[in-house]
Amino acid sequence: MTSAVGNTGMAAPQRVAALNRPNMVSVGTIVFLSQELMFFAGLFAMYFVSRANGLANGSWAEQTDYLNVPYALAITVILVSSSVTCQFGVFAAERGDVYGLRKWFLITIILGSIFVIGQAYEYFTLVGHGLSIQSSVYGSAFYITTGFHAAHVIAGVIAFVVVLMRIQKAKFTPAQATAAMVVSYYWHFVDVVWIGLFITIYFIQ
């Protein structure tokens, strides 16, 4: 009887410890996104410093005239829509609905790819107007900030492809559902960053 009580007493702290132990996937995701947040904060700071210098010498305003705001708004809507489809995919993963996960993540991949292609076309148009990364301070700030963001979008699209490939090759598991959720966190983060960039570059200018 004493032994049983003793074992119960030992088991309770172990259960409490297990419950209090942080989820390493969640911790890793938070750390990674925090690093990304600091990276983009640096890009925003660089943009505003460049803007202040450009406004001081009068070269900034004339460069912003090349921006096609309605076009940028259209591809922004596409990217934001991809965040919605991504979340629908996560909901499907939580239900164990593999077909739904594949469908919504595939749509997300398509929308993300359209955004990247749309941004590449914008670059092509701006270069045609003489605005390149080497043409001015504004050009450098514009291409560096939007270019790094585009690279993150491409990385997100690749991550979605990897998740879909893993689902195709093996039985759907909780680990795969977790992977889908982690990728969605990254994608939502990238979308929020773009909204900030869009407001800064195309409206504040």
Swiss-Prot record:
Q: State if Coiled coil is listed as a keyword.
A: no
Membrane topology per the entry is: Multi-pass membrane protein
Class of this enzyme: translocase
Q: Which CDD domains match?
A: Heme_Cu_Oxidase_III_like
Q: What keywords is this UniProt entry annotated with?
A: Cell membrane, Membrane, Translocase, Transmembrane, Transmembrane helix
One term of GO molecular function: cytochrome-c oxidase activity
| Transmembrane region(s) | 29-49, 73-93, 104-124, 144-164, 184-204
> What family does the entry list?
Belongs to the cytochrome c oxidase subunit 3 family.
Description of how the protein assembles with itself and partners: Associates with subunits I, II and IV to form cytochrome c oxidase.
Could you tell me what this protein is called? Cytochrome c oxidase subunit 3
Gene transcribed to yield this protein: ctaE
